[in-house]
Swiss-Prot record:
It comes from Homo sapiens (Human). It comes from the Eukaryota. Residues 178-189 have a biased composition (Low complexity). This is Putative uncharacterized protein CDRT15P3. Residues 1-80, 164-197 are annotated as: Disordered.
Amino acid sequence: MFVRPESGEQGPETLAPASGAEIQRFPVPAVEPVPAPGADSPPGTALELEEAPEPSCRCPGTAQDQPSEELPDFMAPPVEPPASALELKVWLELEVAERGGQHSSSQQLPHCSQSWAQWKLWRQRPGFAIWAPLPHWRGTSLIQQSSSPAAEGPAATAAGAVCLPAGGAGEQEKEPVSRGSSRSSCSQRRPPPPGMEVCPQLGIWAICP
């Protein structure tokens, strides 16, 4: 049996509209005004737009932390080509010649009265021996190239060679001293024969009348 409710009572289905006092119980969030273009923005907004500072220490393993394998041209070490055998040979010859010149100039020996030009003419006379230096690593320091078939018996020294007229073996003096040996010291060298002087510039014994 269905009973109709009275007009004064409201059923659960019917909801009365909320009054203004009940609406004001819940606060409504305030809406901030949007600034017009060109106007100064509030300081809070400006701080939000600033970029965040980069961290001082970066995360390990990034590509920026790993050094580059290719160095710039100004940082790369210069690559020197290997010296050839000819360059080493020339360097050794210059080094030995320089040390020999310093050693001979340090000795207080009489100077030859002949000049280099006179010596060249003198040693080209027939009957005299011409001496040409050999590299020091071949065992001998000088070799005899005779300008006369009668010249025999080489006399080679490290500091110089005895150059005498070609003749008997008794007229020639020999000074077999090799560079680097114990006999090449100044105290053990024999004095020049009579009628000859030591020329430090030429490194030989020459006849100086």
